[in-house]
Amino acid sequence: WKRREKPVMEPHLAWEKITVMCPHVLWEDELQCYRMWYSAGRMHEADAIGIAVSKDGITWEKDADNPIFTPNPEKYWEIGKVEACFVCPKRNGWYHMFYLGMDGDLIACVGLARSRDGKTDWQRHPSNPIIAGFDGSWDWSGICKASVLETENGYMLWYNGCNRRFEEIGLAVHDGFDLGFPKEGEEGVDERGDGTGLGGVNYYVRDCIARY
């Protein structure tokens, strides 16, 4: 590996404050360019998500409409920040974005949203957060920084989980490719059940697989 002497992206816009971080890059055949979804804002934990494009992966053009994804003030679980997204390649006309949301106490959960073009009209999952800790769990204070792999049977999602003492790597598994979004034009139903992160839509098998 040969590192470049200077960063390929720096914060220079008002919303970016002092930080650009958590890059997630896809090569887009239709656009014939790289697209980067990135987080920006304060140090350590960013505030919102932006997008940029590049032909060579070095020189990036930030979108004039950034940030493209910001906290929803009507949803307490993500009222503080949204950041550290993982965007799956387009499938059946949709980009699916797994993202970190933080509440007013900076407790982190994983949410899911989708968009036709990967930039505009993001539709949040009606049962967000789709993966959340609960009192007494090994990952109660934070589930974040998802990394997602599509398999023959559905999805595997690895994440950072923490409980203010340890930070560990967890795994969530989803059977099938129907992620539970409502049909277009419908509002959908919140299926979170008892609010523990283990009911209804949270049909993920969660487990700790590594400690570091």
Regions found by a protein language model. Give the residues of each.
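Carbohydrate-active catalytic/glycan-binding domains of CAZyme proteins
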Residues: 1-212
